């Protein structure tokens, strides 16, 4: 069975790719540049991960209209990228308004054209930053949208294998699957060495700490995030 991967180049999409590869899907990978600060590094990570898993069918999409819309510190350089707040319950400034719906719409279009019946995305609800478009209920609803908005014979289903995992579980699963974490990129701020202090870096570093493993990518600083 053929499956499309939404592959950002981050840790979650990497492990999702490893899971889909293990399950034997014929994989096609989509990467979206939406005007984010670290788009060049993320694109490099996408290509490296796709090379690692020998994924030859790829689509690199430009959706920089999301950057022009603004409203997120990931795309609007007038908004600072906030430091880590691992206990915060609010929606952070890094939230890109309705981003995942845009990504899914493009991925469903491509899936329909190339005959893919499954669509993988590395969304995480349990240990995410509180993004509303990373919740299971969102993907359940979007599967209904696909059912109503595509040809009856299309049969595309979104799969979210990480949705209920904690970040530390994702690291453990990735290690068990031999996922090349050194090719992934999570930092919101930097394309050189990861900053180590943005929310995404902090969640990643804490996950590796909880597993007793050193994250293989380079950091400007490596704070301890376990109390």
Swiss-Prot record:
Single Gene Ontology BP annotation: queuosine biosynthetic process
Keywords, alphabetical: ATP-binding, Ligase, Metal-binding, Nucleotide-binding, Queuosine biosynthesis, Zinc
UniProt cofactor(s): Zn(2+)
Residue sites binding ATP per the record: 7-17
GO MF assignments: ATP binding; ligase activity, forming carbon-nitrogen bonds; zinc ion binding
Similarity field: Belongs to the QueC family.
Protein name: 7-cyano-7-deazaguanine synthase
